[in-house]
Amino acid sequence: MSGIPSKTDVVVIGAGVAGLAAARRLSIAGREVCVIDASDEVGGRIRTDQVDGLLLDRGFQLYNPSYSEGISVLDLKALDVKSFTPGVVVSIDGRNYKMADPKREPTWAIDSLLAPVGKISSKLKFARYAVGLAISKSKSASYDQRTDAFLRASFGTDLTDVLLRPFLAGVFLEPELATSKRFFDIALKSFISGTPGVPSAGMQAIPRQLAAQLPSGSIHLDVTAQAVARTMVRTDLGDIRCRSVVIATNARSAALLIPSLKVPPSNAVTTWYHLADCPGSELTEGKSTLVIDGKKFRGPLDDPSRPLVNTVVMTNSAPSYASNGRTLISSSATGVHSSTQAELGVRSHLAALYKVPTGNWTHVATYPIPDALPMMAPPHDIEQSVRLSDGVYIAGDYREVSSTNGALASGRRAAEALLTDDL
């Protein structure tokens, strides 16, 4: 894309939600901002493809309307977030058991209590911990550790391996639960505070709404940043002189621009989309509820018969994701898998999870995403410095926590630091 300016106040590199949040704050403060991105659309990792009347998010993603940053910068009514059921269905030995917050899904209360996912005392202990988190004002615990170690020590092996680990593997996108307990606490608190879902127009509606708040002509796509200095950004289309720079790319791209920058590794995911040959009302009681395999971590991690960490009927809550009343299923596995054999294994696992034949389901798309989520290993600093050097700032969920809220917060903090320094 041509037409980049030769001069501006601030260059923001990256048109994901972190970069857009930074640009929004700077524009409100009266700064002239130029946002550049190497991609052909805004959104970064939050992208939605429209294919034959279907909305296909690139990887299974949800948005929680309780996110504090989103409340401040997004029009949630316009996003029309379609909430999923606040719970999970756990598949164990040929049966499906419903687990949910009894206050929000009271009809599932008995099932939640009696499901063979651990001792009742362990479930009650976990519930008390979750309630305590919900009312806590603290941002993070002073001591950090691996989530897996904390869960086993606190709630026992059965509850951890049969319920918590299968669920959290799909949240963290890593099966070992080597992720920071600080991040676990933040994620759990958000699940309690609000019910995640998807915008009716797809997840990319979020960055598109942020982009629409910027002055016309602020965003320049198909532009690759090649080098950064305080007063200049070199791109493949020419140099842009500026007073300050905000680097809001993903971690890998940021490290290419700033070789001294330490960035975390990324967790990978593969998401498959299928159209079922039955109405959504025949699957998970017509609800959009995550289905997980309670036996997935009772055997080898690479068991080909149990590839998935979760699956959900998208259209039970968000019928706009498939035209003409079709039933769209989203299913995910950690790691990168793109072979035909992998899809056949997924289809077989889906039959076991939903308890229906899946041989006639239509495979729509596969999205292998190697850099799906920054790894949050302990000890993790949830508010890392946004100042890189004089006039150069950095933003991204890997600098905060791996979530849309973390990206929004990081972008805002980078912009506010710039404004403070540029008085």
Language model region names:
Residues 67-71, 75-177, 190-193:
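Mobile amphipathic helical/loop "lid" adjacent to a hydrophobic cofactor/ligand pocket
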Residues 5, 226-343, 352-353:
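Mid-domain catalytic core of redox enzymes
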Residues 27-51:
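Glycine-rich FAD pyrophosphate-binding loop
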Residues 2-3, 319-423:
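Conserved flavin/dinucleotide-binding core of flavoenzymes
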Residues 49-73:
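N-terminal glycine-rich dinucleotide-binding loop that anchors FAD/FMN and/or NAD(P) in oxidoreductases
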Residues 5-35:
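N-terminal Rossmann-like FAD-binding beta1-loop-alpha1 element of flavoenzymes
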Residues 18, 41, 252:
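Conserved Rossmann-like nucleotide-cofactor binding loop
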Residues 186-236, 240-244:
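Helical element adjacent to the flavin cofactor pocket in flavoenzyme catalytic cores
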